[in-house]
Amino acid sequence: MKSEKIVITVLGILLVISIIVIGYLMIKINENSINIEYSEDAIMFKYNYERLNGKKNSDGNVYNTLSIAINNPIKYVNLEELVNIIDTEDGIIYISSPTCPYCRATVETLLQVVKDLNISKIYYYEIFTGNDVANYDELMKELEEKEIVKVNNDSKYSWGVPVLLQTRNGEIISKINGVSYELEENQSKYDSLNEEQKEIVYNRYYDALNK
């Protein structure tokens, strides 16, 4: 009987200790969760792309479904900042739009390449924004001279997105426009890519950024 009481007492003590330890660990986990902060730009980038998941555009085309990591390294820039970064900084620049089907088809693969290469910042310019700046024409002319945009027959600027640039010492050392994969039969540009197409995109972006 005495030994049974000892066993029960020991088990009770171990139970109390276990509860205390578990409680402490849960508190620390909650504290760590609360202290995690994600940049507003990363959250906005995720939202802007994912909010169109499964939605139809004005032509009835359905946007593919994306899952963007909330800790992505995106930093939004305006048109003037974009030109200044190209002229003066060492950096990587992504020019795109959430409504561009080719951009949506390749953005997850781009972010995977960025993660694999441990790239901590991607400057992001979203086209169709910043057209109301006072020096818009001057800025776009400079981008045209750098062959980042083109002027169409109707005198409107064309970006050829998605565009990926890497700059160093004020020079563009790598540039990718558009996509290089081919669509399969019955595959729409709005559809997600197959594994072979993803590999083509991955290798293209990896080679461009691994310099």
Task: Report residues per predicted region.
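Positively charged n-region of N-terminal signal peptides that target proteins for export
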Residues: 1-6
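N-terminal leader/targeting and pre-domain segments
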Residues: 7-15, 21-88, 189-211
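Thiol-based oxidoreductase modules, predominantly thioredoxin-like and allied folds used
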Residues: 67-77, 95, 119-146
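Short active-site neighborhood of thiol/selenol oxidoreductases, capturing the structured segment around
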Residues: 84-100, 110
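Loop/turn elements at helix/coil->beta-strand transitions in domains of secreted/extracellular proteins
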Residues: 88-92, 117-121, 161, 168-169
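C-type cytochrome heme c attachment motif
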Residues: 98-105, 162-165
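Typically the conserved alpha-helix immediately C-terminal to a functionally engaged Cys/Sec
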Residues: 102-117
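Non-catalytic, surface beta->alpha helical segment in thiol-disulfide oxidoreductase systems
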Residues: 154-211
